[in-house]
Every structure is written in C-alpha cells, then in structure tokens.
Amino acid sequence: MELLVFVSSTCAHCPKAEQVVRIVCPEYSEYGLTYEKVRTRSQRGSELSEKYMVMSVPTLIFLNDKGIEINRIIGVPSEIGLRNKIEILLGIKETFLKKIFGNKKKWTKLIY
C-alpha cells in the first residue's frame, strides 16, 4: 500500500501533515506501507493532482498495490487517527462495526 501526501509550499497546514506522516508511516513499513510527498506545483504533482482530483491540501491518498485509490484524508490527521486508518486499511485492526457484527457472510446466512 502506498500513501501519497499532497502538499503545497503556500499551505500553512501542510508541514504538520508531513510531520504526522513522517512519524507514523515508518511504523508500518514492515507491512509494505510506503509514502511519497507530492508537491502539487511540480510537473508530477500537477499530473497526480489531476488524476486523483485533489482539490485542497494537505490531502493524503491511500493506494492499493495496483495504484487504485482505496481511501483519502483531507486535512491534517492526528497521529492516532492516521494509525487507525492505516491499521484498518492494512487489515491489522477491525472496524468498530466488524467487531460488533462480525463477518458479513456469517450474518447473511443467519438472515436468509
């Protein structure tokens, strides 16, 4: 999984978002998480911003192994919030509803 961190040099909140990513993401490198800082005013940044329809910065976009967007965060995430999101997307942590209701297939069998 890859995390693209869209930032701009004129953005007041982007340095904080970058700091949170630099602190949290290395903890998940053993799970295959990589991250890349994307400057929206660069050639590549402009192309990626258009491709993923980034309208504001900071924006964090999670991509699966095929490069398809699976989630995004707009704004500055907290360290805890980013950890939770990463763990859910990597399958390390179950969502609250999954903890309560369990596997959807199991419930489907009970209902029908």
Where do the PLM segments sit?
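Conserved residues at beta->alpha junctions
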Residues: 8, 39, 73, 77
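Conserved redox-active cysteine motifs that mediate thiol-disulfide chemistry
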Residues: 6-20
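Short helix-loop-beta junction
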Residues: 23-31
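A broad, structure-centric signal for solvent-exposed, well-ordered loop/edge residues
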Residues: 45-47, 61, 80
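Thiol-based oxidoreductase modules, predominantly thioredoxin-like and allied folds used
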Residues: 6, 30-45
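Non-globular targeting/processing and membrane-anchoring segments
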Residues: 1, 15-16, 22-23, 50-56, ...
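Hydrophobic beta-strand anchors of alpha/beta hydrolase catalytic cores
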Residues: 3-4, 60
